[in-house]
């Protein structure tokens, strides 16, 4: 590899916006490395990072409120380009001598059209339409109450709307730019081109961050880190651990041992599929532990969702610890930690979020496990992990499957988990997913699954009355899984799935469809 793929980089300072990670993903998609830090980072950390440019992201606070977040002063003296987005533009304006006024119910939320004024590097050769006066018009997405009322000295207006005098501003000499809208969201039609102008033309970055270069870099770093030692990996068959396995195989070959723990809470035939793909097809060395009885025994009588998650996590760690001790030469433990995990566990450098559900795979490994940690995905977002998985030869169908919770069916069987319930649920879920594929809807929705409800309902089969279990179909559409709407599937499809489940699975008498959005509901039931 000729160039260091981390050498040219952008720093994004987060002020709490729900879109901040989206900015980082857009910059990565352009082909440039970036990191996401909290707004209150130390000046020395920025100096050490030495970014080619800095982006000040949005946030829910008001610049006019006492004690609201501010960018470190060094941002404006570092001599690198700066782009302020929404709150980022407002705090930049205020900190450099402009002023911001509190919105009095007249903010802009949703679609807006801005008119470009004059020539700016940020909007160069970009337009969605042309005004009668010849100026470019751009379709953008606004989300602000406060607004800049006076811009700092040296700045000019480069775009406005009918109600927002300073929709975008620039100090071209210092290469400081501010936009009141969100270029990172898809509703801003030319947003990707604006970010590309900033990162490549204004900051001067090259596109070194590609799937092939990421793989090459990860393999080289793991070879240097691991040397001739052996590595152990908990392989679940999910996206992250699967991609880690393929990267490690490329880096160290048969010095990798995978431990696959079948907890009895997987999807239909999933355990066999994992062994067939990674053991037989890719030739990985896998220890297959069938622990269904052990997991179900430990969960017997437990109906609290959080307690179930903790039991599943604890038993997995116990089994993994037992197996790792048998591998006397293993000096390293590999994990599928990805960048959003790093951001969250930093507590995060990006604010304080309430723990809604515990994640069984974050932390929790024994303190006495004397192994080094190998985390080749810790810089990557999920979409990047999937792309390098494709490059490594993993099948599209596996990489782009809908999300499956770490505790598996343990949180899709409501209440106490029993083998009978899991077996019924597995078959019902397989029918639902099969029919979505047949209808060419599987990849058009974001997540679909079946939930087992611990209630019986009266049904009629032929001339006989039956009293059997109820399941719920759940199908949602979302961009970021932070919010979601229930999928408006065709009634005929829902009816067909229901008929198949009731007729083909002895033990289920009723099928319902969940029409709850997020919020107020969560996507998973537990």
From Swiss-Prot:
Pathway entry: Purine metabolism; GMP biosynthesis; GMP from XMP (L-Gln route): step 1/1
Keyword Transmembrane among record annotations: no
GO MF annotation: an example: ATP binding
Ranges of residues in domain Glutamine amidotransferase type-1: 9-208
SUPFAM superfamilies: Adenine nucleotide alpha hydrolases-like, Class I glutamine amidotransferase-like, GMP synthetase C-terminal dimerisation domain
Matches recorded under InterPro entries: Class_I_gatase-like, GATASE, GMP_synth_C, GMP_synth_GATase, GMP_synthase, GMPS_ATP_PPase_dom, NAD/GMP_synthase, Rossmann-like_a/b/a_fold
Superkingdom of origin organism: Bacteria
UniProt keyword terms in alphabetical order: ATP-binding, Glutamine amidotransferase, GMP biosynthesis, Ligase, Nucleotide-binding, Purine biosynthesis
Positions of the catalytic residues: 86 (nucleophile), 182, 184
Name of one Pfam family that matches: NAD_synthase
Catalytic activity field: XMP + L-glutamine + ATP + H2O = GMP + L-glutamate + AMP + diphosphate + 2 H(+)
Record EC number: 6.3.5.2
Binding-site list for ATP: 236-242
Nucleotidyltransferase among keywords: no
Domain GMPS ATP-PPase: 209-401
Recorded GO CC terms: cytosol
Function per UniProt: Catalyzes the synthesis of GMP from XMP.
Quaternary structure annotation from Swiss-Prot or TrEMBL: Homodimer.
HAMAP family: GMP_synthase
Protein name: GMP synthase [glutamine-hydrolyzing]
Gene that specifies this protein: guaA
